[in-house]
Design a protein with these regions (language model features):
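Residue-level signal for the short linker/turn that defines the boundary of a DNA-recognition helix
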Residues: 15, 25-26, 52-55
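Alpha-helical residues within the helix-turn-helix
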Residues: 22, 33, 62
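Residue-level detection of the helix-turn-helix DNA-binding "recognition helix"
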Residues: 18, 22, 36, 47-49, ...
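Short, charged recognition helix plus adjacent turn
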Residues: 1-7, 72-80
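Short alpha-helical DNA-recognition segment
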Residues: 25-44
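A short, Lys/Arg-rich alpha-helix, primarily the initiator
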Residues: 1-24
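DNA major-groove recognition helix of helix-turn-helix/homeodomain DNA-binding modules
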Residues: 55-70
């Protein structure tokens, strides 16, 4: 059986949050505040995002008036 390298859901979500941050020109401190974490925690998430919680994600989405689908690459490039 072939082994498939797949990206974990938490890593995918974190990558999309970082992409959104870059596109919106948001500072690390502003991002940390919207996730209710310390700024250094962002670097921990960069290494391994498995500790990001749904509570943190929900707060981030709420503060920024986003929906989960807004973080999706496909929602911008291939609307349905």
């Amino acid at each position: 059986m072939n082994s498939i390298n797949r990206m974990t859901l938490y890593k995918l979500i974190w990558c999309r949050i970082r992409f959104w941050q870059n596109m919106q020109d948001i500072s690390d401190q502003e991002l940390a505040d919207s996730l209710q974490v310390a700024k250094r925690t962002l670097k921990d998430y960069d290494r391994n995002a498995k500790n990001i919680t749904l509570e943190k994600l929900d707060h981030f989405l709420s503060v920024n008036s986003l929906k989960l689908k807004d973080l999706s690459y496909y929602s911008h490039s291939n609307p349905r």
